[in-house]
From Swiss-Prot:
Subunit structure: Forms linear homooligomers, giving rise to a RAD51 nucleoprotein filament, which is essential for strand-pairing reactions during DNA recombination. Interacts with BRCA1 and either directly or indirectly with p53. Interacts with XRCC3, RAD54L and RAD54B. Interacts with the BCDX2 subcomplex RAD51C:RAD51B. Component of the homologous recombination repair (HR) complex composed of ERCC5/XPG, BRCA2, PALB2, DSS1 and RAD51. Interacts directly with PALB2 which may serve as a scaffold for a HR complex containing PALB2, BRCA2, RAD51C, RAD51 and XRCC3. Interacts with RAD51AP1 and RAD51AP2.
Gene Ontology terms for molecular function: ATP binding; ATP hydrolysis activity; ATP-dependent activity, acting on DNA; ATP-dependent DNA damage sensor activity; chromatin binding; DNA polymerase binding; DNA strand exchange activity; double-stranded DNA binding
Pfam families: HHH_5, Rad51
Modified residues (Phosphothreonine): T13, T309
Residue location of crosslink Glycyl lysine isopeptide (Lys-Gly) (interchain with G-Cter in ubiquitin): K58, K64
Full protein name: DNA repair protein RAD51 homolog 1
Subcellular location: Nucleus; Cytoplasm; Cytoplasm, Perinuclear region; Mitochondrion matrix
Family, per entry: Belongs to the RecA family. RAD51 subfamily.
GO cellular component, one term: nuclear chromosome
Length: 339
């Protein structure tokens, strides 16, 4: 009897272990989905059961060889494996309390963000040039590898660079500050240069496949909007640009939901030239319009302070109060400003 109870307990824990984290798409085969259909899904960029469950039906039907009936069956089976219904606010609150936050390297900045950069959501940083956007990204690429009790995420970092500003030397300097092996830190950062908006989107499909294979804690896109400013020009292409940008941001949000990674994107600003600019305290606004504003969970506005100091302001957040913090850009990454 005791032996039977032990076996049942072991079975329970194995079920719990399996349901924790993203589930490989091969699990759909155990639910009666044809292996060839699963292969077609994988070739189309779906690497987890969650990715399938979160996808709209028309996206599955657009895959060659997947009929409407097959799409219905696939979605039904995926929904059984992924909890997508209602839950109590108590349960959701419990899940929120388990969210990991990644340190920025500055105690003041972490205090402003109530712990650091939140995993499982999109954080947008925008500001002029030389305000510290890329420097925060470089620091985060190292701190996300730290143990959780040191403010890290115990995972690798993925860095999509669209402006050619990624510098491994900066990572080595930050690694030395935290007592980490420089070669290990560099090995744990997957880097890709984005050359156009279609390529930038294609890189997210590769990112999804890599996140299934290994544990990533952070995905950086620096900058998310730079290529959209060059690939699309004029008001005639504005609608196409915004649709493409919305798809890209939706994919980022899906990766944050699926894998629980912290997604950090940087954004540029544009000067307002309309009549309202005369009365605005700061006539600069982030580009991307409402689409990027709605996609980002937390928006941070960075501006220059005196010397090497920078000021970060909570521009928009569902739970953080509007406030400011000062930080500095040092030789070994982002840190606190000296009085």
């Amino acid at each position: 009897m005791a032996m039977q109870m032990q076996l049942e307990a072991n079975a329970d824990t194995s079920v719990e272990e399996e349901s924790f984290g993203p589930q490989p798409i091969s699990r759909l085969e155990q639910c009666g989905i044809n292996a060839n259909d699963v292969k077609k899904l994988e070739e189309a960029g779906f690497h987890t059961v969650e990715a399938v469950a979160y996808a709209p039906k028309k996206e599955l039907i657009s895959i060659k060889g997947i009929s409407e009936a097959k799409a219905d069956k696939i979605l039904t089976e995926a929904a059984k494996l992924v909890p997508m219904g209602f839950t109590t606010a108590t349960e959701f609150h419990q899940r929120r309390s388990e969210i990991i936050q990644i340190t920025t390297g500055s105690k003041e900045l972490d205090k402003l963000l109530q712990g650091g950069i939140e995993t499982g959501s999109i954080t947008e940083m925008f500001g002029e040039f030389r305000t510290g956007k890329t420097q925060i990204c470089h620091t985060l690429a190292v701190t996300c590898q730290l143990p959780i009790d040191r403010g890290g995420g115990e995972g690798k970092a993925m860095y999509i660079d669209t402006e050619g500003t990624f510098r491994p030397e900066r990572l080595l300097a930050v690694a030395e500050r935290y007592g980490l092996s420089g070669s290990d830190v560099l090995d744990n950062v997957a880097y890709a240069r984005g050359f156009n908006t279609d390529h930038q989107t294609q890189l997210l499909y590769q990112a999804s496949a890599m996140m299934v294979e290994s544990r990533y804690a952070l995905l950086i896109v620096d900058s998310a909007t730079a290529l959209y400013r060059t690939d699309y020009s004029g008001r005639g292409e504005l609608s196409a640009r915004q649709m493409h940008l919305a798809r890209f941001l939706r994919m980022l949000l899906r990766l944050a939901d699926e894998f629980g990674v912290a997604v950090v994107i940087t954004n540029q600003v544009v000067a307002q030239v309309d009549g309202a600019a005369m009365f605005a305290a700061d006539p600069k606004k982030p580009i991307g319009g409402n689409i990027i504003a709605h996609a980002s969970t937390t928006r941070l506005y960075l501006r220059k302070g005196r010397g090497e100091t920078r000021i970060c302001k909570i521009y928009d957040s569902p739970c953080l109060p509007e406030a400011e913090a000062m930080f500095a850009i040092n030789a070994d990454g982002v840190g606190d400003a000296k009085d």
